[in-house]
Amino acid sequence: MPLLDSFKVDHTRMHAPAVRVAKTMTTPKGDTITVFDLRFCIPNKEILPEKGIHTLEHLFAGFMRDHLNGNGVEIIDISPMGCRTGFYMSLIGTPSEQQVADAWLASMQDVGNVKDQSKIPELNEYQCGTYQMHSLAEAQQIAQNVLARKVAVNKNEELTLDEGLLNA
């Protein structure tokens, strides 16, 4: 099985919250797709609570589109990482890490401004596979944490995993 790019970076050196360009690729038609690692937590030291990350998934996707889409950028998908330390965001275009960080911070402000659980989009059994597993309070605590700590940039060249550790 091929080793995925996400496992070629040293998770012990990652900062959080931080944005990282995880991958770029060009489609056959010439569009650039960029995948960003939006790391909310320091790997193996912090973890996002399941209800909070789920609620954040519902809110973050819309808010990031509000703040980042346009001028050659269109978000394809924002999905939580299985390890619950962040999200991957795939988009068409090549925004800078700073543009992504600014949109992320603005989105966290938006999460903090959601008044009650009834305002969470798609929060029903028809549009959500686990619609009862949500917590606006947890999502807002995650957002507050990001706002308090700010968003750094994780650079791939600083996180390259030593070859000797690849299958440790």
Curated annotation (Swiss-Prot):
Keywords: Autoinducer synthesis, Iron, Lyase, Metal-binding, Quorum sensing. Binds 1 Fe cation per subunit. One of its GO terms (biological process) is quorum sensing. Its cofactor is Fe cation. It catalyses: S-(5-deoxy-D-ribos-5-yl)-L-homocysteine = (S)-4,5-dihydroxypentane-2,3-dione + L-homocysteine. Fe cation binds at H54, H58, C128. It comes from the Bacteria. GO terms for molecular function: iron ion binding; S-ribosylhomocysteine lyase activity. Involved in the synthesis of autoinducer 2 (AI-2) which is secreted by bacteria and is used to communicate both the cell density and the metabolic potential of the environment. The regulation of gene expression in response to changes in cell density is called quorum sensing. Catalyzes the transformation of S-ribosylhomocysteine (RHC) to homocysteine (HC) and 4,5-dihydroxy-2,3-pentadione (DPD). HAMAP family: LuxS. Belongs to the LuxS family. This is S-ribosylhomocysteine lyase.
